């Protein structure tokens, strides 16, 4: 579940949507956590999907440390990549703010820490 003090905003045609803070989110705050509404798919289930659903999973999911694909039910799926990210995945199904995130600032994550082929 994405932090409640966020909103979804269209950025542009190339990037699409992003998640933005509506209030200050202090450093160390949990910004996203896996919850029961998120879909967790095994690689076998993912590969059995029809092309339309497979495209959605490929675009919006990430691979967890078990090699499963996690598809967020809320707009947590729209957190964009940045090499200078303000959020960090812990590897334990939640993310934290690694610095203060100001109102109007986009929440970002460094995708380099996600979707690793090997733990």
Language-model features and meaning:
Residues 1-119:
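Conserved catalytic SET/PR domain of SAM-dependent protein methyltransferases, capturing the structural core
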């Amino acid at each position: 579940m994405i932090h409640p003090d966020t909103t979804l905003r269209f950025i542009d045609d190339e990037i699409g949507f992003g998640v933005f803070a509506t209030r200050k989110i202090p450093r160390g705050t949990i910004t996203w956590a896996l919850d029961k509404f998120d879909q967790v798919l095994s690689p076998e289930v993912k590969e059995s999907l029809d092309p339309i659903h497979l495209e959605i999973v490929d675009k919006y999911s990430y691979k967890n440390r078990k090699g499963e694909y996690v598809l967020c039910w809320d707009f947590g799926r729209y957190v964009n990549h940045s090499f200078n990210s303000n959020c960090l995945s812990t590897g334990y199904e939640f993310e934290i703010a690694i610095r203060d995130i100001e109102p109007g600032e986009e929440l970002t994550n460094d995708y380099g820490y996600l979707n690793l082929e090997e733990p």
